[in-house]
A protein has these predicted regions:
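Catalytic core of pol beta-like nucleotidyltransferases
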Residues: 1-16, 24-30, 41-90
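Short beta-strand->loop micro-motif that forms the acidic, two-metal-ion catalytic signature
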Residues: 35-39
Length: 90
């Protein structure tokens, strides 16, 4: 997962990503999806989260949920959970 994400971050000019959910907690099983927050930069187009999700799905054969950090409400339960359990990539 990490290598595939790193390649796509570079391709789409994103700064980094945060893996969260079952893969970050090391609780994933065969049915688990991949949950990812992308941290864009000045050259990142936020609509590219869809491209990243699709390419990861094709590469890894897993369902993928990708969000851009700016989509999250700072201080929300979701945001706090991601920040608490997330694993930085890149």
């Amino acid at each position: 997962i990490f290598a595939a994400v790193r390649l796509l971050l570079k391709k789409y000019h994103a700064e980094s990503a945060i893996l969260f959910g079952s893969y970050a907690r090391q609780e994933a099983d065969a049915a688990s999806d991949i949950d990812l927050i992308v941290i864009g930069g000045s050259k990142f187009d936020p609509t590219d989260v869809f491209c990243i999700a699709e390419e990861l799905h094709r590469t890894l054969g897993k369902a993928v949920d990708v969000y851009e950090l700016r989509e999250l409400n700072v201080g929300s339960v979701f945001y706090n959970t991601v920040m608490a359990e997330g694993v930085q990539i890149a």
